[in-house]
């Protein structure tokens, strides 16, 4: 009987943590990239990077608006439009 309780608790923990996306995107919104800066995208300083960022946001954001390289104090980051 105790084994069943331990198994049930472990299963509950696994299911709970499987709903958390490690990269910080919500499961509820489909992992959409919208309205966020994305340091994981990599460098984003040139016109070519700007076009690559826009394509990346178009593919990963549900609103179809794309994105741009946003100037930041520590270098540019890809930012997807809201």
From Swiss-Prot:
It comes from the Eukaryota. One of its GO terms (cellular component) is extracellular region. The keyword rRNA-binding does not apply. It holds the Pfam family Defensin_like. Residues 1-24 form the signal peptide. Transmembrane segments: none annotated. It is found in: Secreted. Keywords: Antimicrobial, Disulfide bond, Fungicide, Plant defense, Secreted, Signal. Disulfide bonds join 34-82, 44-69, 53-78, 57-80. GO terms for biological process: defense response to fungus; killing of cells of another organism. Its main location: secreted. Belongs to the DEFL family. This is Defensin-like protein 22. It comes from Arabidopsis thaliana (Mouse-ear cress). The lineage of its organism: Eukaryota, Viridiplantae, Streptophyta, Embryophyta, Tracheophyta.
């Amino acid at each position: 009987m105790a084994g069943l309780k331990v198994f049930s608790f472990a299963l509950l923990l696994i299911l709970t943590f499987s709903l958390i996306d490690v990269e910080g995107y919500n499961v509820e919104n489909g992992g959409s990239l919208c309205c966020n800066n994305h340091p994981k995208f990599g460098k984003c300083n040139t016109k070519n990077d700007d076009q690559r960022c826009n394509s990346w946001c178009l593919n990963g954001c549900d609103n179809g608006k794309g994105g741009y390289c946003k100037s930041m104090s520590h270098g540019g980051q890809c930012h997807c439009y809201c």
